[in-house]
Every structure is written in structure tokens, then in C-alpha cells.
Design a protein with these regions (language model features):
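An aromatic- and glycine-enriched ligand-binding surface/loop that stacks and positions planar moieties
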Residues: 1-10, 150-382
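Short coil/turn linking the two alpha-helices of tandem helical-hairpin repeats
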Residues: 83-85, 90, 134, 154-160
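Short, solvent-exposed loop/turn segments at the edges of secondary structure
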Residues: 86, 139, 146, 178, ...
Length: 436
């Protein structure tokens, strides 16, 4: 989830102990950052697998082929990770020894083309030689095939070599046609309610007995921290039930952005076509479009005071301090028409691409048994605690992450709660997206 915060899809923001993220800009990067350069320890382990398997006198040929394929898969994935972050990397493909120190003088790949050539070579071996079935948590030929198609598609994007498109399509089609797996409508693919769905071709699994919410940032750093007193002071129209104690007691600093939310299209109720929420007929018929450049004062859109007298405003003074003509803070300014029978949240979020509902926590949805309010003054909103712009372990964007979260942490979302957690490394749906 930290890498998602390096994209327009997410942010990392804390206005308390962790501070504001300054690594999301080029000015925040330095030679002191490790963005995947130092993978030599991992590569040594992988290369030892490949070398020792090939030199084994106890393994039969079938065992050698399969075990070596595991090594090729892991090396291909490491190289792919490095290529995506840096383009070029040091392609370590042998096991170094103290007796031959000169062997470590390996130059970086000449260019991106050489980088992807090495990646594809390793992943093709894995896609050919891994077994078609394996225990949950172990890779198969089908998982390797999807990874191969992913890497080949990326290779085409950065090299322009059209032959990689053939590799991507062939690998994806092989998985779709021959794996015997079908797409699932289950949203439990991304949480604990459907851990072993067949569409998950390869997952990383952690058992409940030794896994806690605090063990992973994807959990501890996505659940907010909001008390009953916060909600009362904020005058939220919807109270938190707090059925098992404080429901949300995480340290959220990662949040999805409006940029990401806008990518999930809405079905137009008149035409049946998928389009951005702000272009649908049902939305346009219920709002008046105003000029966003006319927003010049704090609280101009909406404002009120909490019980303790603290102001809560849209926009906030900080919003107005961050104006940049190249990247406007305010891009849309709409007012709900008088007499409209639906509010803005319903108009924005109803009829979305179904993936939206498994990925994002949004205003008026249900989350861990609570009805979520994310509008001004809401129970999990940006200003519900003492930071008007959010960031005290609560949202700064108006949304929370739901994908790959735990839907029903027992008894509640706090650091010591034990959970059964998994991450999808590869799933069948990606093969279809590659073909598309």
C-alpha cells in the first residue's frame, strides 16, 4: 500500500507523529533511498536454488525441472520489480564465492530492452515448467503465466517491441483456456471471507494464530482511530455503535484519492452507458454547475462549529494555502438542486462499477458493522478529530481503503486483533484484463 501512495491512486499523510509525506516528489528522493537496488541477498538465495538443483545428485530430472522453475520465477519477479522501479539493474545470475571476487564486477543492463529480455526468459521457464496444481500459497504454471503476461505487456510499453504483445496474449490465453478456473463474483477474494477462492491463482497467506492487525501496514495503517467522544463533539448525524469497544482503533495514514475514485465509472440511468459520475444524466439533472475558480474563502462551500467551538469548513484555510494554477485544488463545484429527491452521495456512488464497492470505503456505506459518514462533520470524516484537514489517523481525502482489508476483525479493528490475512499475488481476472 505504500507503493500505491507513490501514484495518483493513493496518499500517505499524517499530521501527527509520522508527519507529512515528502517522498512523493522528486525533491524527496536521494541516493539514500533504496527503491529496489539492494536485492543482492535475495538474488543470492534464488541463484543458489537454481545452481544447487541443477548440480544435485539426489533429485531426479522431474524434480530438478520443477524446483529450478521456482527459482526462475522468483528471479524473474525480482528483476521485474527492479525494472519497473529503475529500468536498468545489475543482473546477478550466479552464486558468488570468496575464491572468485572478480565475478561480482557485473555491469548494469545496457538498457530497458536488455532488462526485459532477462525478465521474460526467467518467467517463460517458470510458465513452462511449474506444476499445473499446487498447495494454496505455492505458485503454479497458471500463476507464472499471468506474471509472464504482466511483464510482457510492460515490456512492450517501454521497449515498443510488438513481439512482447504476442507473448502477453499467448500466456494470458493459455491460462484462460487451460487452467480450468473461472471468474468469480465474490468480493471475498480481497478479504478474509473467501480466502481460497479458485480465482486466486497464487496468494500469500497468514494464519490467524500468528497474525495481528499491527503486523501489516495494510491493516494497521488503513483503519482510522475515532472515539465516541470525537463523534459526539463533531455532531455527526450518525453515531458509531462501538458494539465491542471502540470499533476503529487503527493508525490510518494511507488513503485512496478522488483521482482513483473517479476512475470507477457509473451506469447512466437514461442511456445505460458507463461514464464518470459527474457526466451521468442522473447527476446532471439534480445539480447546478458552479465555477470552481469562484471559491476564494474558507467555509465558502459549507461550514459549522463543533461542540467545543472548533470551526469545520469546506474549503479549509489550508486548502487555500495550497493553490497551484497547474494543479488546481478545486476542479468541480456543484450544488444540489432544491427539491432533489437524492443527495449528492447517492448520486455520486450509486450504480458504480462493482469493483468500487470492494476497493473503497465511501460516504454512507457500511464498514465493520458501522454506517460510515464521510461528509462534513461525519463520524469518520476528515474533521472528526481535532485536525480540520484530517490526518490524525483519520482520512485526509474523504475515503478509506477497503481492498485487501479485513471485513470482520474480531472483536474490532485494533492493533492486537488476530486475523487471517491474505494478499492476491495473481488472480485469473488479470489474464482477461491483459487480453483486453
Amino acid at each position: 500500500i505504500s507503493w500505491e501512495a507513490r501514484t495518483p491512486n493513493g496518499v500517505l499523510c499524517s499530521q501527527v507523529g509520522e508527519g507529512i509525506d515528502n517522498v512523493a516528489t522528486e525533491l524527496g528522493l536521494s541516493t539514500g533511498n533504496d527503491w529496489g537496488v539492494n536485492r543482492f541477498g535475495l538474488l543470492r538465495k534464488v541463484n543458489m536454488i537454481i545452481t544447487n538443483v541443477q548440480n544435485s545428485s539426489t533429485l531426479n530430472e522431474t524434480e530438478k525441472i520443477e524446483l529450478k522453475a521456482h527459482g526462475n520465477l522468483m528471479r524473474g519477479m525480482i528483476f521485474f520489480d527492479q525494472a519497473r522501479k529503475m529500468g536498468r539493474f545489475v543482473p546477478v545470475k550466479e552464486v558468488f564465492t570468496v575464491e572468485n571476487p572478480e565475478a561480482v564486477n557485473i555491469p548494469m543492463t545496457e538498457d530497458v530492452s536488455e532488462s526485459y529480455k532477462l525478465i521474460i526468459e526467467d518467467l517463460q521457464i517458470a510458465a513452462n515448467d511449474l506444476p499445473i496444481e499446487n498447495a494454496s500459497g505455492l505458485p503454479t504454471r497458471w500463476a507464472a503465466g499471468v506474471l509472464l503476461s504482466r511483464a510482457a505487456l510492460q515490456a512492450y510499453a517501454y521497449t515498443g517491441d510488438a513481439s512482447y504483445l504476442d507473448v502477453a496474449i499467448t500466456a494470458a490465453d493459455d491460462v484462460i483456456s487451460n487452467s480450468g478456473v473461472e471468474l468469480s463474483n465474490s468480493n471475498g477474494l480481497f478479504n478474509e471471507t473467501d480466502l481460497y477462492n479458485p480465482e486466486i491463482l497464487w496468494g500469500y497467506y497468514r494464519e490467524k494464530e500468528n497474525t495481528y492487525v499491527s503486523s501489516f501496514e495494510e491493516l494497521m495503517r488503513t483503519y482510522p482511530n475515532v472515539s465516541t467522544d470525537n463523534v459526539i463533539n463533531s455532531q455527526s448525524p450518525v453515531a458509531l455503535k462501538q458494539a465491542n469497544g471502540q470499533t476503529f482503533e487503527g493508525w490510518a495514514i494511507y488513503f485512496p484519492t478522488q483521482d482513483l475514485v473517479d476512475q470507477f465509472l457509473v451506469t447512466d440511468e437514461e442511456t445505460g452507458k458507463a461514464m464518470p459520475w459527474y457526466e451521468t444524466s442522473q447527476y446532471k439533472n439534480n445539480v447546478t454547475v458552479l465555477d470552481p475558480s469562484s471559491i476564494t474563502e474558507a467555509g465558502q462551500v459549507d461550514a459549522y462549529k463543533q461542540v467545543n467551538g472548533d470551526a469545520r469548513r469546506i474549503p479549509t484555510p489550508q486548502d487555500l494555502n495550497q493553490l497551484n494554477k497547474s494543479y488546481p485544488t478545486f476542479t468541480r463545484y456543484h450544488q444540489l438542486n432544491k427539491g432533489a429527491d437524492r443527495d449528492l452521495s447517492e448520486l455520486m456512488y450509486s450504480g458504480r462499477d462493482r469493483r468500487f464497492y470492494t476497493a473503497i470505503v465511501y460516504d454512507k456505506c457500511s464498514w465493520i458493522g458501522e454506517t460510515v459518514e464521510l461528509n462534513l462533520g461525519g463520524n469518520l470524516s476528515a474533521g472528526v478529530r481535532d485536525k480540520e484537514d484530517g490526518g490524525w489517523y483519520n482520512t485526509t481525502t474523504g475515503y478509506y481503503w477497503r481492498k485487501s482489508n479485513i471485513e470482520n476483525p474480531t472483536p474490532r479493528a485494533y492493533h492486537n486483533c488476530q486475523v487471517a490475512l491474505h494478499f492476491n499475488i495473481v488472480r485469473l481476472g488479470e489474464a482477461y484484463m491483459t487480453i483486453a
